[in-house]
Amino acid sequence: MTDYKDTLNLPETGFPMRGDLAKREPAMLKNWYDKNLYQQIRQTSKGKKTFILHDGPPYANGNLHLGHAVNKILKDIIMKSKTASGFDTPYVPGWDCHGLPIELKVESIVGKPNEKISAAEFRQACREYANEQVDRQKADFIRMGVLGDWDNPYLTMNFNTEASIIRTLAKVIANGHLYKGSKPVHWCLDCGSSLAEAEVEYEDKVSPSIYVRFKACDETAIETLFNAKGNGPISAIIWTTTPWTMPSNRAIAIHPELEYALVQLADERVILATELVESVAKAIEAESFDILATVKGETLQLLRFHHPFYAFDVPFIFGDHVTTEGGTGLVHTAPDHGTDDFIIARKNNIEMAGLIGNDGKFKSDVEFFAGLAVFESNEKVIEKLKETGALLKLARIKHSYPHCWRHKTPIIFRATPQWFIGMEKQGLRAQALAEIKTVRWIPNWGEARIDTMVANRPDWCISRQRTWGVPMAMFVHNETEELHPRTLDILELVAQRVEQQGIQAWWDLDPTEVLGEDAQHYHKVPDTLDVWFDSGSTYASVVEQRPEFNGQTADMYLEGSDQHRGWFMSSLMLASATNGKAPYQQVLTHGFVVDEKGRKMSKSIGNVIVPSEVWNKNGADILRLWVASTDYTAEMKVSHGILNSAGDAYRRIRNTARFLLSNLNGFIPARDEVKPNEMIALDRWAVSCALEAQNDIIEAYEHYQFHTVVQRLMRFCSIEMGSFYLDIIKDRQYTTKADSLARRSCQTALWHIAEALVRWIAPILSFTADEIWSHLPTVEGRSEFVFTEQFYSQLFTLNCHDKLDDNYWQQLINIRAEVNRVLEQARNEKTIGAGLEAKVTVYANDEMLPLLHQLGNELRFVLITSQAIVKPLSEADVAEGELAGLAVKVERAEGEKCPRCWHFATDIGTHAEHNAICGRCVENVAGKGEVRRFA
């Protein structure tokens, strides 16, 4: 018997079935960088409209975690999709290089500055350490397939960037936003420095809970105001969880509109907010109480009470922050240790106490508590309160308390002389709030979030008492502490030196070089700038300076949702203060990475997944696909199981691509492409399907909805292609003549689809797209890399006069699904095996009957059965199925199985020269080839 295998057009491609991404990706990366891919993209994009995504700088310390991977991959997807949409998309990655975490790490290696090593040597060690960290992190970002100007990133410790940061400070001063003052700031005892709002985390802490008596100075005056008597001494009762602040108490705050009660409590009288009398009585375990009288808070102003253990008295003052949500309605006020306390104390001309030093200990002249660390002093304060009879009740409470984000230790509010950007100076708060409304926030709830934060944020303390940071580079008068009158000129001179020598130039600077004779009256400000000032000013030091950005405002900032109070906030404050406008047009935020149960990644739980583990095992494309397929607007769940699911989705996409490529074997577009109006109907429909998918995918990319891109891509690969079109065309691809219209029409469709598909996936599955690109049929003038291409423009829609329109094929899909259901039943009943063993009779109602008749004898190819007959539903001898108006009968196909096409036919053996195969195959092997019109 003749072997007809060689007469078939079997699929063939060098594109492997298995991705083996972990092995193949590094070689692709090497090729990208050997060929300078990023610069190729820049070159081909020259002259196009620019889209600027300004990279928020990760901190140059430690290993990358999945949050870093999510962030950089999202940015890369956007940049690549924007390139494909016709934009010039320069991407300059950056790093945040100054600040405490690096100092602490370097201290552990070389010791503290000015102890074992000079400050200058320490700064150099910090610079070298940061460079090492940048190199490590950079290698990992590159391994993820992220394209950018990795050879020329921006570092906040680059000399030119440090100089630009100083110039931004000069603009802040020039515009009247800077002032010096003593205000309570978040202070970390371990850092020995103030903290920014964004560096504060809230964790549960167990603290003492104390109710304290402040005995009245004039009991008669109080009896008169309340118009009540009673028995025993009178006290105002406060509640606090920070006993260590009691030595700094300078007032008691009450609300003028609240009602206050004079309460008989056993053998003493106490003042409490009326609403809270019952809850306080319960908390202090009072057996009984009697409200003697009540008055409005406004009548009690300036009553005075003895400090619990110091020989001075403190007044009642009004404060709008006083509520009845807890406590006693009378608020212990220590101006050094709380923002509200500070504000109302200043309003009432009450001085701060200044009892705590930079080391977090009571100063040597503080009575009873000299030298004690603040938290250690709690018990001593409680003992003193007991000793003086001021302690009404002691308990313990677990509550949310501010902690340092680095040390994970409790912090304090502490008043220190610092430099601030004033939120009310020159209308900065109002300006920033107005700018928020001009920005597109994605998701849109981000607008309300940052609006609330800006509306309520305190003045920004920008000074730090650190060694490794950009200096404030100012001189102040020895006596008045006023800035030198030539401060702006001096800052520019310093900036010019820093541009050449780095920040050490400031500490090496002899004041006489810039001040002349004034040098004897002025001294250098020793502080460095908050690192949030460094990163917050990159709109000026990077976006306004790099030539590829053309001085434009950034189109987008993209970071995690914690950056509303971090980088988004600091950038907005500085840009509003210096330029009078927001530094960004769009802000996109993504959620945090959690495990499948919604828990944070934690070594103690054992749920940490390291990015390098993923790409070393599965490949970076699997990591990228997980990022893209996850809705980033919420928490992003990940586990090994979830990554395996991403692997399954990847295989579906890869298998689709492989089918397309393997069936383009021998297809040369310039020679073999079939014009749209000459293509077979089903092929035209497949291309129009791809166009519809492309429109959806491009729209999803434009709206940054990457999970929608993946869903639409999967639908196209699995439903429209995998379970319908690609299944149907196998017979035509494999069995018709190699150069027949039937086959070339199909190959033309597959080629268009492959050209489109590779561009759709390139922003997400970058390595796989590069691999597919290298296996596509050669086209003259084709770029070497898919990443320099735009979305495919040669897809076409169905002709408006085409009777077999999209609606027609959608109905055919539904009919075929019903036929497949009945075929599956027949298989289960052992009536048939494969679908080609079947003869189906389709009984259709008046609406569907003409649809099926249009295909004539080619209906069987759509249904993938050997025979298909169409009859009116009225003739049916089987019941309707799940599709109304349709009944399907399945019988065994007539005739024998053709060994070449596997269809059953009754004419096998009737052709003398080819008596083993069916007449259709004879025509394809020895004749002119069968003619197809529809499928």
Curated annotation (Swiss-Prot):
Catalysed reactions listed for this entry: tRNA(Ile) + L-isoleucine + ATP = L-isoleucyl-tRNA(Ile) + AMP + diphosphate
Motif 'HIGH' region: positions: 58-68
Location in or out of the cell: Cytoplasm
One CC-aspect GO term: cytosol
Enzyme Commission no: 6.1.1.5
Keyword Zinc: yes
UniProt record, GO biological process: isoleucyl-tRNA aminoacylation
Alphabetized Gene3D superfamilies for the sequence: 1.10.730.20, HUPs (3.40.50.620)
GO MF, any single term: zinc ion binding
Keywords (A to Z) from UniProt: Aminoacyl-tRNA synthetase, ATP-binding, Cytoplasm, Ligase, Metal-binding, Nucleotide-binding, Protein biosynthesis, Zinc
Residue sites binding ATP per the record: K603
InterPro entries per the UniProt record, alphabetical: aa-tRNA-synth_I_CS, aa-tRNA-synth_Ia, Anticodon_Ile_BEm, Ile-tRNA-ligase, Ile-tRNA-ligase_type1, Ile-tRNA_ligase, M/V/L/I-tRNA-synth_anticd-bd, Rossmann-like_a/b/a_fold
Binding note for cofactor: Binds 1 zinc ion per subunit.
PANTHER family, A to Z: ISOLEUCINE--TRNA LIGASE, MITOCHONDRIAL, SOLEUCYL-TRNA SYNTHETASE
Subunit structure: Monomer.
Function: Catalyzes the attachment of isoleucine to tRNA(Ile). As IleRS can inadvertently accommodate and process structurally similar amino acids such as valine, to avoid such errors it has two additional distinct tRNA(Ile)-dependent editing activities. One activity is designated as 'pretransfer' editing and involves the hydrolysis of activated Val-AMP. The other activity is designated 'posttransfer' editing and involves deacylation of mischarged Val-tRNA(Ile).
Protein name per the record: Isoleucine--tRNA ligase
Gene: ileS
